[in-house]
Amino acid sequence: MTTKRKPYVRGMQPNWWTKLGFYRFYITREGTCLPQLWFSLVVLFGVFALKNGPESWAGFVGFLSNPILMLINIVTLIATVFHTATWFKLAPKAVNIVVKDEKLPQEPIVRGLWGLTIVVTVVILAVALIV
């Protein structure tokens, strides 16, 4: 049996996500994938430039010294720190660490992740400056 009635289709505005703070935050966090894509492509381009010799590397460094690219890279850095901070706050919610029959609070886990990030960053910078 068929009917001629149309099913109700609720309207959806293109800016539906701007009405609630949770959705704005979620879309902003997920939007950080675009600067991450940019960073990945720049690193990939740099690896190929390094592989192709000094002239190619000099061209890559010249490419990166463009003021517009510096601005884009600063935005990418800010987006990366934001993305990292949100994931570090999310990580303790995904794991249950029990110490002496009590659940470990979120703060030590987040601080540990930031501490590990700082240590790894310092080690990488030290190796880069030594070599």
From Swiss-Prot:
Transmembrane segments: 30-50, 58-78, 109-129
Superkingdom of origin organism: Bacteria
Membrane topology: Multi-pass membrane protein
Claim: Cell membrane is one of the keywords in the record: yes
One GO CC annotation: plasma membrane
GO molecular function: succinate dehydrogenase activity
Subcellular location per the Swiss-Prot or TrEMBL entry: Cell inner membrane
This protein's UniProt keywords: Cell inner membrane, Cell membrane, Membrane, Transmembrane, Transmembrane helix
Stated family: Belongs to the FrdC family.
Purpose of the protein: Two distinct, membrane-bound, FAD-containing enzymes are responsible for the catalysis of fumarate and succinate interconversion; fumarate reductase is used in anaerobic growth, and succinate dehydrogenase is used in aerobic growth. Anchors the catalytic components of the fumarate reductase complex to the cell inner membrane, binds quinones.
Quaternary organization: Part of an enzyme complex containing four subunits: a flavoprotein (FrdA), an iron-sulfur protein (FrdB), and two hydrophobic anchor proteins (FrdC and FrdD).
Protein name: Fumarate reductase subunit C
